[in-house]
Amino acid sequence: MLSSSLSNDNENNRRNYVSKSNKNGLVFECSELKEELKRLSIMNRNNIYSNVWMRNIGFSKQQQVRNYSVLPTNAKKIKEHNKSALDLSGFTPEYIRNFCIIAHIDHGKSTLADYLLKETNTITAELLKDNAQFLDRLQVERERGITVKAQSCAMFYEYNGKKYLLNLIDTPGHVDFSYEVSRSMGACDGALLLVDSGQGVQAQTLANYFLALEENLEIIPIMTKIDQQTAQPELVEEDMTGILGVEKDEIIKVSAKTGLNCQKIIPAVIEKIPAPEPPKVSEGETPGALKSLIFDSWYDEYFGVVSLVYIAQGSVEVGDFIYSHANVKNSAKPTKYQVTKLGIMNPDQVPTDKLYQGQVGYLICGMKSTKEAQIGDTLYIWDSKIEPLPGFKQAKPMVYAGIYPLNTAEFDKLRDVIDKLLLTDRSVTIEKETSAALGTGFRCGFLGLLHMDVFKQRLAQEFTIETIITAPTVTYKIVTKNTGKKTSFNTVEDEIIEYIDNPNDFPENPEAEVYEPMANCTIMTPREFVGDIITLCQERRGVQIHMEYFSAERVSMQYKIPLNEMIYDFFDKLKSMTKGYATLDYEEAGFERSDVVKLTVMLNKDPVDALSYIVHESKAYFKARDVVQRLKKLISRQLFEVNIQCAVGLKIIASEKLKAFRKNVTAKCYGGDITRKRKLLEKQKEGKKKMKQLGSVSVPQDAFTVLFSEGEIEDADLSD
């Protein structure tokens, strides 16, 4: 406990706190203490393993970073902590291996990563018991049991009398996060390709395999979960040799859960995966100059942007002044950054004074926003001349939706937290938009529905802000005939092409040609479910491209399906009808002409912009009936009748009426002339009619959230 006493000296703005529990009776200055606790809480959280791994790889006590769980008592000691850092100069490229783990979802990536951390003494077995899937740090990853963010970790391992630095990157397996995988491969020279011994080669296994081949990575095939009763190692081995083209003697059969045969993995990594090599030097470049690739970043409350970098060439140390190539290219007056902190992830932040060629680590240099820290950018010393590294292909969103704060007063907060979240997820695109029903928000592009759902969950869990996400849609291509508009060359274009991702931008012109995006889908399934899958794909307007039997029981089916037919429940239905055995991978396949229409929802003839949909003409009626029936249950009864309608153009195709509350105005009439009752009823009728003309229907904010879900809806609370 700290007891406080107000000082009466000449410094009126300072308050001193005396620690009764401290043997020396140390006095803390409040201003210094506040700053120390902020900085040291981060240091303590990020460096609790520092002494453990340094002892394990043979560093002396003098070389070890002090344990940050013992808090220093003044600013001078904090500086001493910062000076005490790991020396990585002994790990030249020949003693470095950079690799990632790739696989289909739930094929054992995170479990194998846990084993490697334990085998290299990066973390203890006791700590791992309470923290399975150690590298899955996000709450959403823990709850869903999936990897969302690629995580890196530096491991030290002694092999044949030599110490090696192994940089591991654990990647996601779901197709919605394939951009994370491709980014991670940019910092790697090899990959561990995992295949579940009970499920065999799946759709995302193939997708990741081809990504690794494109990056020229050395691939080590590994069969996982061989200890399970459902394991079929012989059949899966045939799959791997036949589909992936690997040799049987190359496959390492392991159980990461029990550790069976896992001791073969690290030697294979050291022997088979090549050491990192510098890029070729172009004419005019400064020889040996720093080339550092940013392949991930996140926001720290106290230090700003933290960039995860791969040192492709040269070295960087604390105090260096660096430029960002993207900043230099796009700014008339580029910003010069000074490196303030460097380190490696082991698995948390461990400081070092310098990073060398081939190494992976974090870098802090005073960047503050997403515009400054661009994924795929090249960092270099300010006075050198270099050619930038290739970087990454920008992810193209497949699904769009509007995101609005549940509380409209929290728009500024939503803008700030989205900006911070974009540092860790650059595949999301945003654009400000306004809705009459929901207020001001953002139009966001995602790689898939799971990606969108995870993004919303992270907003709620990491930044405590509740949001409304509108119905997802895709990008449509609109082609209209030009009526005489001239270009800058004074010529008339034959047609005008534009792309829209918001239903409210859908053209009213009936002569406009609409093209919808298509997707090439690869479905891997057991043979017994082929018939059901064909029916599902036909219902979603799919066209079969190819079907191949890899074995007596395994089938690969390729379909071209409109992307709009896949973004709702296609994957869920596929999993349900195949008992979870079928897997799906897809990629964009251009645009095709389609008869799609805009579905407008109206309440008492007033359109609700947030409830517009774009659907195929053949399904417009069924969608309209579903929407009006769901709205009828969600909207509370009013004092006047509410007409809920869905229209395509000027034609109403579905309608429901929500009856008004009715007061018994004749309750006080006891017998007498019937004309008195009629007069009261006519007066009430006229009042209701006038109220309907002047009144407006309010849709509760939380009703939008329920409406955009696919579950059953209970009737609205009529007590309001």
From Swiss-Prot:
CDD domains found in the cross-reference section: EF4_II, EF4_III, LepA, lepA_C
Gene3D superfamilies the record matches: 3.30.70.240, Elongation factor 4, C-terminal domain, Elongation Factor G (Translational Gtpase), domain 3, P-loop containing nucleotide triphosphate hydrolases, Translation factors
Keyword terms, alphabetized: GTP-binding, Hydrolase, Membrane, Mitochondrion, Mitochondrion inner membrane, Nucleotide-binding, Protein biosynthesis
InterPro entries with a match to the protein in the record: EF-4, EFG_III/V, EFG_V-like, EFTu-like_2, G_TR_CS, LepA_C_sf, LepA_CTD, LepA_IV
An annotated Gene Ontology molecular function: GTP binding
Main subcellular location: mitochondrion
tr-type G domain ranges (all copies): 94-277
BP term (GO), one: translation
Statement: the UniProt record of this protein carries the keyword Membrane: yes
Enzyme Commission code(s) on record: 3.6.5.-
Membrane topology qualifier: Peripheral membrane protein
Subcellular location: Mitochondrion inner membrane
Catalytic reactions on record: GTP + H2O = GDP + phosphate + H(+)
Binding-site residues, GTP: 103-110, 170-174, 224-227
GO cellular component, one term: mitochondrial inner membrane
Purpose: Promotes mitochondrial protein synthesis. May act as a fidelity factor of the translation reaction, by catalyzing a one-codon backward translocation of tRNAs on improperly translocated ribosomes. Binds to mitochondrial ribosomes in a GTP-dependent manner.
Homology family: Belongs to the TRAFAC class translation factor GTPase superfamily. Classic translation factor GTPase family. LepA subfamily.
UniProt miscellaneous comment: This protein may be expected to contain an N-terminal transit peptide but none has been predicted.
Entries under NCBIfam families matching the protein: lepA, small_GTP
Protein's UniProt name: Translation factor GUF1 homolog, mitochondrial
Organism of origin: Naegleria gruberi
Lineage, top ranks: Eukaryota, Discoba, Heterolobosea, Tetramitia, Eutetramitia
